[in-house]
Amino acid sequence: MIMTESTVAYPTRPSNWTFWAAGALGILATAVAAILPVLVGVWQKQAGLQVDQAGFVAATELFAQVAGTGMFLWASPRWTLRTIAVAGLCVMVVGNIATAGSVDFASLMVARGIGGAGGGVIRALCMMSLAKALSPGRAFAVYAGAQVGLAAVTTAFIPHFIETQGVRAPFLVLTLASALGFALCPLLPRHSPLPPSAIRQRGPASYPMAAILAIVALCVFFAGQGALWTYLAPIGAYRSIPAAGVTQALTLLNFAGLAGALGVGAMAHRVNPRIALLTLLATEIISIVGLFRVHSPVGFIASAGAFYFSWCASFPFQFTVISQSDSSGRASAVVPAADGLGLAGGAALASVVLPTLGLGSAGWICAAASVAGITLYIWSATLSKMPARSMQRVAAVDSATLEG
Protein backbone atom coordinates (compact mmCIF):
# COMPACT_ATOMS: atom_id res chain seq x y z
CA MET A 1 0.00 0.00 0.00
CA ILE A 2 1.34 3.46 -0.91
CA MET A 3 0.94 5.79 2.08
CA THR A 4 0.61 9.40 1.01
CA GLU A 5 1.28 12.35 3.28
CA SER A 6 -2.44 12.86 3.63
CA THR A 7 -3.12 9.35 4.91
CA VAL A 8 -0.23 9.52 7.37
CA ALA A 9 -1.24 12.89 8.76
CA TYR A 10 -4.99 12.27 8.73
CA PRO A 11 -5.75 8.57 9.12
CA THR A 12 -9.45 9.32 9.21
CA ARG A 13 -11.32 12.06 7.44
CA PRO A 14 -12.81 14.66 9.82
CA SER A 15 -16.44 14.02 10.70
CA ASN A 16 -19.27 15.82 8.96
CA TRP A 17 -19.90 17.74 12.18
CA THR A 18 -16.45 19.28 11.81
CA PHE A 19 -17.36 20.69 8.40
CA TRP A 20 -20.73 21.98 9.58
CA ALA A 21 -19.12 23.66 12.60
CA ALA A 22 -16.37 25.24 10.50
CA GLY A 23 -18.91 26.41 7.92
CA ALA A 24 -21.17 27.94 10.57
CA LEU A 25 -18.23 29.79 12.11
CA GLY A 26 -17.22 31.02 8.66
CA ILE A 27 -20.72 32.36 8.00
CA LEU A 28 -20.65 34.11 11.38
CA ALA A 29 -17.34 35.75 10.46
CA THR A 30 -18.78 37.15 7.21
CA ALA A 31 -21.81 38.78 8.85
CA VAL A 32 -20.31 42.27 9.07
CA ALA A 33 -18.91 42.13 5.54
CA ALA A 34 -22.37 41.13 4.29
CA ILE A 35 -23.92 44.34 5.60
CA LEU A 36 -21.00 46.72 4.97
CA PRO A 37 -22.81 48.65 2.19
CA VAL A 38 -25.69 49.31 4.59
CA LEU A 39 -23.37 50.17 7.47
CA VAL A 40 -21.47 52.73 5.40
CA GLY A 41 -24.68 54.68 4.86
CA VAL A 42 -25.71 54.31 8.50
CA TRP A 43 -22.33 55.48 9.82
CA GLN A 44 -22.58 58.49 7.55
CA LYS A 45 -26.11 59.47 8.62
CA GLN A 46 -26.44 58.40 12.25
CA ALA A 47 -22.83 58.43 13.45
CA GLY A 48 -22.06 61.77 11.81
CA LEU A 49 -19.17 60.49 9.69
CA GLN A 50 -18.19 61.95 6.35
CA VAL A 51 -18.54 59.77 3.27
CA ASP A 52 -14.79 59.17 3.03
CA GLN A 53 -14.57 58.38 6.76
CA ALA A 54 -17.31 55.75 6.50
CA GLY A 55 -15.48 54.29 3.52
CA PHE A 56 -12.23 54.17 5.51
CA VAL A 57 -13.98 52.21 8.27
CA ALA A 58 -15.28 49.70 5.72
CA ALA A 59 -11.81 49.39 4.16
CA THR A 60 -10.31 48.86 7.62
CA GLU A 61 -12.69 45.95 8.17
CA LEU A 62 -11.67 44.30 4.88
CA PHE A 63 -7.92 44.80 5.28
CA ALA A 64 -8.09 43.62 8.89
CA GLN A 65 -9.63 40.38 7.62
CA VAL A 66 -6.64 40.00 5.30
CA ALA A 67 -4.35 40.49 8.32
CA GLY A 68 -6.41 37.88 10.17
CA THR A 69 -5.65 35.39 7.41
CA GLY A 70 -1.94 36.03 7.96
CA MET A 71 -2.41 35.48 11.69
CA PHE A 72 -4.10 32.14 10.99
CA LEU A 73 -1.26 31.02 8.69
CA TRP A 74 1.19 31.87 11.48
CA ALA A 75 -0.84 30.05 14.14
CA SER A 76 -1.82 26.93 12.16
CA PRO A 77 1.56 25.15 12.54
CA ARG A 78 1.64 25.95 16.25
CA TRP A 79 -1.92 25.60 17.60
CA THR A 80 -4.83 23.24 17.16
CA LEU A 81 -7.95 24.24 15.23
CA ARG A 82 -9.94 24.41 18.47
CA THR A 83 -7.48 26.81 20.06
CA ILE A 84 -7.35 28.99 16.94
CA ALA A 85 -11.17 29.10 16.76
CA VAL A 86 -11.48 30.14 20.41
CA ALA A 87 -8.84 32.85 19.96
CA GLY A 88 -10.49 34.17 16.79
CA LEU A 89 -13.93 34.29 18.41
CA CYS A 90 -12.51 36.13 21.44
CA VAL A 91 -11.04 38.80 19.17
CA MET A 92 -14.36 39.08 17.28
CA VAL A 93 -16.29 39.53 20.53
CA VAL A 94 -13.90 42.25 21.71
CA GLY A 95 -14.16 44.02 18.34
CA ASN A 96 -17.97 43.92 18.26
CA ILE A 97 -18.30 45.15 21.85
CA ALA A 98 -15.83 47.94 21.09
CA THR A 99 -17.82 48.88 17.96
CA ALA A 100 -21.04 49.09 19.96
CA GLY A 101 -19.28 51.43 22.40
CA SER A 102 -17.50 53.57 19.79
CA VAL A 103 -18.03 57.31 20.11
CA ASP A 104 -16.01 58.77 17.23
CA PHE A 105 -14.22 57.99 13.97
CA ALA A 106 -10.92 56.92 15.58
CA SER A 107 -12.51 54.51 18.06
CA LEU A 108 -14.69 53.02 15.31
CA MET A 109 -11.61 52.44 13.12
CA VAL A 110 -9.79 50.65 15.95
CA ALA A 111 -12.86 48.58 16.85
CA ARG A 112 -13.44 47.36 13.29
CA GLY A 113 -9.74 46.65 12.92
CA ILE A 114 -9.95 44.31 15.92
CA GLY A 115 -13.23 42.70 14.85
CA GLY A 116 -12.08 42.28 11.26
CA ALA A 117 -8.85 40.57 12.33
CA GLY A 118 -10.81 38.03 14.37
CA GLY A 119 -13.16 37.45 11.46
CA GLY A 120 -10.20 36.89 9.14
CA VAL A 121 -8.83 34.19 11.43
CA ILE A 122 -12.17 32.37 11.51
CA ARG A 123 -12.74 32.64 7.74
CA ALA A 124 -9.28 31.20 7.02
CA LEU A 125 -9.97 28.35 9.45
CA CYS A 126 -13.26 27.67 7.67
CA MET A 127 -11.63 27.55 4.23
CA MET A 128 -8.88 25.18 5.35
CA SER A 129 -11.45 22.87 6.94
CA LEU A 130 -13.72 22.82 3.87
CA ALA A 131 -10.71 22.00 1.68
CA LYS A 132 -10.36 18.68 3.52
CA ALA A 133 -13.94 17.60 2.77
CA LEU A 134 -14.55 14.55 0.58
CA SER A 135 -15.83 16.98 -2.08
CA PRO A 136 -14.38 20.45 -1.39
CA GLY A 137 -16.34 22.03 -4.23
CA ARG A 138 -19.68 20.76 -2.96
CA ALA A 139 -18.86 21.75 0.63
CA PHE A 140 -17.92 25.22 -0.55
CA ALA A 141 -21.09 25.45 -2.66
CA VAL A 142 -23.22 24.94 0.46
CA TYR A 143 -21.13 27.51 2.34
CA ALA A 144 -21.32 30.05 -0.50
CA GLY A 145 -25.07 29.53 -0.81
CA ALA A 146 -25.51 30.24 2.89
CA GLN A 147 -23.30 33.31 2.55
CA VAL A 148 -25.38 34.69 -0.33
CA GLY A 149 -28.57 33.93 1.60
CA LEU A 150 -27.23 35.74 4.65
CA ALA A 151 -26.37 38.77 2.52
CA ALA A 152 -29.87 38.81 1.02
CA VAL A 153 -31.66 38.53 4.38
CA THR A 154 -29.46 40.98 6.28
CA THR A 155 -29.47 43.58 3.51
CA ALA A 156 -33.28 43.58 3.58
CA PHE A 157 -33.67 43.35 7.36
CA ILE A 158 -30.81 45.39 8.85
CA PRO A 159 -31.93 48.91 7.75
CA HIS A 160 -35.26 48.59 9.58
CA PHE A 161 -33.57 46.94 12.57
CA ILE A 162 -31.05 49.80 12.85
CA GLU A 163 -33.80 52.39 12.43
CA THR A 164 -35.80 50.96 15.33
CA GLN A 165 -33.01 49.74 17.63
CA GLY A 166 -30.09 52.03 16.83
CA VAL A 167 -26.75 51.65 15.07
CA ARG A 168 -25.17 49.77 18.00
CA ALA A 169 -27.79 47.00 18.02
CA PRO A 170 -26.40 44.83 15.17
CA PHE A 171 -23.02 44.59 16.88
CA LEU A 172 -24.60 43.59 20.17
CA VAL A 173 -26.45 40.82 18.30
CA LEU A 174 -23.20 39.79 16.61
CA THR A 175 -21.51 39.71 20.01
CA LEU A 176 -24.16 37.28 21.26
CA ALA A 177 -23.84 35.17 18.10
CA SER A 178 -20.05 35.09 18.47
CA ALA A 179 -20.44 33.97 22.07
CA LEU A 180 -22.73 31.16 20.93
CA GLY A 181 -20.04 30.22 18.40
CA PHE A 182 -17.88 28.98 21.27
CA ALA A 183 -20.28 26.03 21.56
CA LEU A 184 -19.14 24.87 18.09
CA CYS A 185 -15.44 24.81 18.96
CA PRO A 186 -15.47 21.33 20.60
CA LEU A 187 -16.59 19.90 17.23
CA LEU A 188 -13.28 20.94 15.65
CA PRO A 189 -10.26 18.58 15.64
CA ARG A 190 -7.80 18.64 18.52
CA HIS A 191 -4.77 18.14 16.27
CA SER A 192 -2.79 20.63 14.20
CA PRO A 193 -4.53 21.43 10.89
CA LEU A 194 -1.26 20.89 8.98
CA PRO A 195 0.55 17.62 8.19
CA PRO A 196 4.09 17.23 9.61
CA SER A 197 5.88 18.09 6.35
CA ALA A 198 3.88 21.33 5.97
CA ILE A 199 4.77 22.30 9.56
CA ARG A 200 8.48 21.82 8.82
CA GLN A 201 8.29 23.79 5.54
CA ARG A 202 7.15 27.38 5.94
CA GLY A 203 7.19 30.48 3.79
CA PRO A 204 5.98 31.18 0.24
CA ALA A 205 8.64 28.86 -1.23
CA SER A 206 6.99 25.88 0.47
CA TYR A 207 3.78 26.28 -1.57
CA PRO A 208 3.47 24.11 -4.71
CA MET A 209 3.59 26.03 -7.99
CA ALA A 210 0.02 24.88 -8.72
CA ALA A 211 -1.15 26.48 -5.45
CA ILE A 212 0.62 29.77 -6.21
CA LEU A 213 -0.96 29.89 -9.67
CA ALA A 214 -4.41 29.14 -8.21
CA ILE A 215 -4.18 31.92 -5.61
CA VAL A 216 -2.98 34.42 -8.23
CA ALA A 217 -5.85 33.27 -10.47
CA LEU A 218 -8.35 33.89 -7.66
CA CYS A 219 -7.04 37.41 -7.02
CA VAL A 220 -7.01 38.31 -10.73
CA PHE A 221 -10.49 36.87 -11.34
CA PHE A 222 -12.01 38.72 -8.39
CA ALA A 223 -10.32 41.95 -9.45
CA GLY A 224 -12.32 41.72 -12.66
CA GLN A 225 -15.56 41.04 -10.80
CA GLY A 226 -14.93 43.96 -8.44
CA ALA A 227 -14.30 46.32 -11.35
CA LEU A 228 -17.75 45.62 -12.82
CA TRP A 229 -19.78 44.71 -9.72
CA THR A 230 -19.04 48.03 -8.01
CA TYR A 231 -20.44 50.03 -10.92
CA LEU A 232 -23.55 48.05 -11.87
CA ALA A 233 -25.87 50.87 -10.80
CA PRO A 234 -24.02 53.59 -12.80
CA ILE A 235 -23.94 51.25 -15.81
CA GLY A 236 -27.72 50.91 -15.59
CA ALA A 237 -28.11 54.68 -15.52
CA TYR A 238 -25.68 54.97 -18.44
CA ARG A 239 -27.88 52.60 -20.46
CA SER A 240 -30.94 54.77 -19.58
CA ILE A 241 -32.48 52.05 -17.42
CA PRO A 242 -35.05 53.52 -14.97
CA ALA A 243 -33.94 53.68 -11.35
CA ALA A 244 -36.66 51.19 -10.39
CA GLY A 245 -35.30 48.69 -12.91
CA VAL A 246 -31.76 49.04 -11.57
CA THR A 247 -32.99 48.58 -8.00
CA GLN A 248 -34.96 45.50 -8.99
CA ALA A 249 -31.91 44.06 -10.74
CA LEU A 250 -29.73 44.56 -7.66
CA THR A 251 -32.39 42.89 -5.52
CA LEU A 252 -32.84 39.87 -7.79
CA LEU A 253 -29.09 39.36 -8.06
CA ASN A 254 -29.07 37.53 -4.74
CA PHE A 255 -31.48 34.90 -6.07
CA ALA A 256 -29.33 34.42 -9.17
CA GLY A 257 -26.25 34.07 -6.98
CA LEU A 258 -27.98 31.57 -4.71
CA ALA A 259 -29.05 29.51 -7.73
CA GLY A 260 -25.50 29.60 -9.06
CA ALA A 261 -23.78 28.65 -5.82
CA LEU A 262 -26.17 25.89 -4.78
CA GLY A 263 -27.56 24.70 -8.11
CA VAL A 264 -24.50 24.50 -10.33
CA GLY A 265 -21.85 24.60 -7.62
CA ALA A 266 -23.33 21.56 -5.88
CA MET A 267 -22.32 19.52 -8.94
CA ALA A 268 -18.66 20.45 -8.46
CA HIS A 269 -17.80 16.85 -7.50
CA ARG A 270 -19.30 15.45 -10.72
CA VAL A 271 -18.09 17.90 -13.36
CA ASN A 272 -14.54 18.46 -14.59
CA PRO A 273 -13.58 21.84 -13.06
CA ARG A 274 -11.76 22.98 -16.20
CA ILE A 275 -14.78 22.36 -18.44
CA ALA A 276 -17.11 24.05 -15.93
CA LEU A 277 -14.85 27.09 -15.57
CA LEU A 278 -14.61 27.58 -19.34
CA THR A 279 -18.38 27.21 -19.77
CA LEU A 280 -19.16 29.71 -17.02
CA LEU A 281 -16.52 32.08 -18.39
CA ALA A 282 -18.32 32.10 -21.74
CA THR A 283 -21.61 32.79 -19.92
CA GLU A 284 -20.06 35.70 -18.07
CA ILE A 285 -18.58 37.25 -21.22
CA ILE A 286 -22.00 37.10 -22.89
CA SER A 287 -23.61 38.74 -19.85
CA ILE A 288 -21.02 41.55 -19.87
CA VAL A 289 -21.76 42.26 -23.52
CA GLY A 290 -25.47 42.27 -22.66
CA LEU A 291 -25.02 44.82 -19.86
CA PHE A 292 -23.63 47.35 -22.32
CA ARG A 293 -26.04 46.56 -25.18
CA VAL A 294 -29.49 46.29 -23.61
CA HIS A 295 -31.98 49.15 -23.59
CA SER A 296 -34.80 47.69 -21.45
CA PRO A 297 -35.09 46.96 -17.71
CA VAL A 298 -35.83 43.28 -18.46
CA GLY A 299 -32.67 42.96 -20.52
CA PHE A 300 -30.58 44.69 -17.87
CA ILE A 301 -32.00 42.48 -15.11
CA ALA A 302 -31.33 39.34 -17.19
CA SER A 303 -27.76 40.40 -18.01
CA ALA A 304 -26.94 41.40 -14.42
CA GLY A 305 -28.47 38.16 -13.13
CA ALA A 306 -26.48 36.07 -15.62
CA PHE A 307 -23.29 37.88 -14.59
CA TYR A 308 -23.80 37.21 -10.87
CA PHE A 309 -25.02 33.66 -11.55
CA SER A 310 -21.87 32.75 -13.49
CA TRP A 311 -19.67 34.39 -10.86
CA CYS A 312 -21.22 32.51 -7.93
CA ALA A 313 -21.46 29.22 -9.85
CA SER A 314 -17.80 29.48 -10.83
CA PHE A 315 -16.47 29.99 -7.31
CA PRO A 316 -17.02 26.39 -6.04
CA PHE A 317 -15.15 25.05 -9.07
CA GLN A 318 -12.36 27.54 -8.42
CA PHE A 319 -12.21 26.34 -4.81
CA THR A 320 -11.97 22.76 -6.06
CA VAL A 321 -8.89 23.66 -8.13
CA ILE A 322 -7.35 25.51 -5.17
CA SER A 323 -7.95 22.63 -2.74
CA GLN A 324 -6.47 20.12 -5.21
CA SER A 325 -3.38 22.28 -5.68
CA ASP A 326 -2.24 21.94 -2.05
CA SER A 327 -3.23 18.94 0.08
CA SER A 328 -2.16 20.70 3.30
CA GLY A 329 -5.03 23.20 3.00
CA ARG A 330 -2.81 26.27 3.39
CA ALA A 331 -3.66 27.57 -0.09
CA SER A 332 -7.38 27.28 0.70
CA ALA A 333 -6.84 29.27 3.91
CA VAL A 334 -5.58 32.19 1.79
CA VAL A 335 -8.87 32.36 -0.18
CA PRO A 336 -10.56 35.07 1.97
CA ALA A 337 -7.51 37.33 1.72
CA ALA A 338 -7.01 36.80 -2.02
CA ASP A 339 -10.63 37.41 -3.04
CA GLY A 340 -10.90 40.44 -0.73
CA LEU A 341 -7.75 42.02 -2.14
CA GLY A 342 -8.93 41.23 -5.66
CA LEU A 343 -12.31 42.88 -5.16
CA ALA A 344 -10.78 45.98 -3.57
CA GLY A 345 -8.05 46.20 -6.21
CA GLY A 346 -10.49 45.81 -9.09
CA ALA A 347 -12.81 48.50 -7.75
CA ALA A 348 -9.85 50.84 -7.21
CA LEU A 349 -8.49 50.22 -10.72
CA ALA A 350 -11.88 50.90 -12.28
CA SER A 351 -12.26 54.13 -10.32
CA VAL A 352 -8.94 55.34 -11.77
CA VAL A 353 -9.65 54.56 -15.43
CA LEU A 354 -13.40 55.33 -15.55
CA PRO A 355 -13.03 59.15 -15.68
CA THR A 356 -10.78 58.82 -18.74
CA LEU A 357 -12.09 55.76 -20.59
CA GLY A 358 -15.74 55.75 -19.50
CA LEU A 359 -17.96 53.08 -17.94
CA GLY A 360 -17.27 50.67 -20.78
CA SER A 361 -13.75 50.19 -19.41
CA ALA A 362 -15.24 48.39 -16.38
CA GLY A 363 -16.59 45.73 -18.73
CA TRP A 364 -13.25 45.39 -20.53
CA ILE A 365 -11.36 45.07 -17.24
CA CYS A 366 -13.80 42.43 -16.00
CA ALA A 367 -13.63 40.41 -19.22
CA ALA A 368 -9.83 40.56 -19.47
CA ALA A 369 -9.28 39.68 -15.80
CA SER A 370 -11.80 36.83 -16.00
CA VAL A 371 -10.08 35.31 -19.04
CA ALA A 372 -6.64 35.68 -17.42
CA GLY A 373 -7.85 34.22 -14.13
CA ILE A 374 -9.52 31.17 -15.68
CA THR A 375 -6.44 30.56 -17.84
CA LEU A 376 -4.29 30.49 -14.70
CA TYR A 377 -6.79 28.13 -13.03
CA ILE A 378 -6.57 25.69 -15.94
CA TRP A 379 -2.77 25.86 -15.80
CA SER A 380 -2.90 25.16 -12.04
CA ALA A 381 -5.30 22.22 -12.51
CA THR A 382 -3.01 20.74 -15.16
CA LEU A 383 0.02 20.98 -12.85
CA SER A 384 -1.97 19.41 -9.99
CA LYS A 385 -2.74 16.37 -12.17
CA MET A 386 0.91 15.78 -13.07
CA PRO A 387 2.10 14.43 -9.67
CA ALA A 388 -0.89 12.07 -9.55
CA ARG A 389 -0.05 10.71 -12.98
CA SER A 390 3.60 10.30 -11.98
CA MET A 391 2.50 8.40 -8.87
CA GLN A 392 0.36 6.09 -11.00
CA ARG A 393 3.29 5.38 -13.34
CA VAL A 394 5.59 4.60 -10.38
CA ALA A 395 2.96 2.26 -8.91
CA ALA A 396 2.59 0.50 -12.27
CA VAL A 397 6.37 0.00 -12.53
CA ASP A 398 6.52 -1.35 -8.96
CA SER A 399 3.68 -3.76 -9.69
CA ALA A 400 5.34 -5.00 -12.88
CA THR A 401 8.64 -5.48 -11.04
CA LEU A 402 6.97 -7.54 -8.30
CA GLU A 403 5.11 -9.66 -10.81
CA GLY A 404 8.28 -10.18 -12.85
Language-model segments: what does each one mean?
Residues A133, V142-R190:
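Helix-loop-helix hairpin linking two adjacent transmembrane segments in secondary transporters
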Residues G120-L134, C312-D326:
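Intracellular juxtamembrane helix-capping segments at the cytosolic ends
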Residues G48, G101-A106, N272, R293-H295:
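Helix-breaking motifs and short loop linkers at transmembrane-helix boundaries and internal kinks
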Residues G68-L81, G260-P273, L354-P355:
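Helix-to-loop junctions at the C-terminal end of transmembrane segments
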Residues A67-D104:
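Conserved MFS/SLC helix-loop-helix module at the cytosolic interface between two early adjacent transmembrane helices
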Residues S325-L359, C366:
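A late C-terminal transmembrane helix in Major Facilitator Superfamily
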Residues L36-P37, A210-T251, F255-L258:
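Extracytoplasmic gate region of multi-pass secondary transporters
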